[in-house]
A protein has these predicted regions:
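ATP-binding N-terminal substructure of ATP-dependent carboxylate-amine bond-forming enzymes
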Residues: 1-87, 91-93, 97, 116-125, ...
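Active-site nucleotide/adenylate-binding loops and adjacent lid/helix of ATP-dependent enzymes
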Residues: 1-7, 50, 91-176, 180
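Hydrophobic beta-strand scaffold residues
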Residues: 34, 80-81, 109, 134, ...
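Short beta-strand-to-turn element immediately C-terminal to the catalytic PLP-Schiff-base lysine
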Residues: 115, 147-153, 188-190, 257, ...
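Glycine-rich phosphate/pyrophosphate-binding beta-alpha loops
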Residues: 143, 202, 268-282
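Phosphate-binding site of ATP-dependent enzymes
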Residues: 155-238, 256-263
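Conserved metal-phosphate-binding beta-hairpin within the catalytic cores
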Residues: 177, 186-188, 241-273, 283
Length: 302
């Protein structure tokens, strides 16, 4: 099979994408005819490199690779590709839309606000949760870029600094209630959930360094949680996967509060596949090697 691995890109997650692309290539180049294309935003060059392949393996993260733009292009050119459809990618990338979908379907998610302003040295926000802990995050970026966590109400200068940090990666920002508790993620492959991973970062939270630097986080697979919680997490994940419109694979992130309440955080339609990535860890716990995982995704995408 002729496969083109599409990687790199021009988003803030370029470095992660390069690592994912290389890992995917190393796992399948001996059994398929594999080429690699480092996408630089030029769609004419992109088409020239993919027009004769059987499948494009999208190893991009963030930006056009994950917001539906690349997917829409491939759909218009009848090029087969891995990952979500254009519509599903667009829904998932916008954290506000994904949370609204969950809220509408009775899946708990932390309170959030989009309508906030900083004026004349004062913060004005409509939601009461802002007075306690909250997270400032870009609506449409991954890998924890631009995120600031406040476990208690910040000073005005701290808040301004966090907004500036978030706006370096996106103009669209949301404030989300901070949920004290455990970080859990569920990987979906086809119509099945894989073993749940608990993430325990060595730092204050699971930031970029914790995600992509070896030994900066501890991963417990499968997570040591009650069977009832496990079943509910898997049920929620499969439901979200389908509501968003994903088919082949996705990864859904949650918080489990101290009183064992589950909260949806976000869905990743093109999760990382680096050496430290969560999806391969989950698959390995289920007895699926990295190479087998990539080939399963390929088969689900043809």
């Amino acid at each position: 099979m002729k496969i083109c691995i599409l990687y790199g890109g021009i988003s803030s997650e370029r470095e992660v994408s390069i690592n994912t692309g290389k890992s995917v290539y190393n796992s399948i180049h001996k059994e398929h005819y594999v080429s690699m294309f480092d996408f630089d935003g030029d769609y004419d060059k992109l088409y020239d490199n993919v027009k004769d392949v059987d499948l494009v393996f999208i190893a991009l993260h963030g930006g056009d690779g994950e917001n539906g733009t690349i997917q829409k292009f491939f759909e218009s050119e009848n090029v087969k590709f891995t990952g979500p459809s254009a519509v599903a990618a667009e829904k998932a990338m916008d954290k506000n839309i994904a949370k609204l979908i969950c809220q509408k379907n009775n899946i708990p998610t932390p309170n959030w606000a989009l309508d906030f302003i900083i004026e004349d040295g004062a913060m004005s926000m409509s939601d009461k949760f802002i007075s306690s802990g909250f997270v400032v995050k870009p609506i449409d970026e991954g890998s924890s870029f631009g995120i600031t966590i406040f476990k208690q109400a910040p000073s005005e200068s701290e808040f301004r600094k966090s907004i500036k940090k978030a706006r370096k990666v996106s103009e669209s920002i949301m404030l989300e209630e901070y949920i004290e508790g455990r970080e859990l993620t569920v990987s979906i492959l086809g119509n099945n959930s894989l073993p749940i991973v608990e993430i325990i970062p060595k730092g204050d939270y699971y930031d970029y360094e914790s995600k992509y630097t070896k030994f900066q986080s501890e991963y417990i697979v499968p997570a040591k949680i009650d069977e009832e919680i496990e079943e509910l997490l898997c049920a929620y994940s499969l439901k979200i996967h389908k509501l968003i419109g994903c088919v082949s694979y996705s990864r859904i992130d949650f918080r489990l509060s101290k009183d064992n309440k589950i909260y949806f955080l976000e869905i990743n339609t093109l999760p990382g596949f680096t050496d430290t990535s969560l999806f391969p860890k989950s698959a390995k716990s289920a007895g699926i090697s990295y190479g087998e995982l990539i080939n399963k995704i390929i088969k689900l995408s043809i």
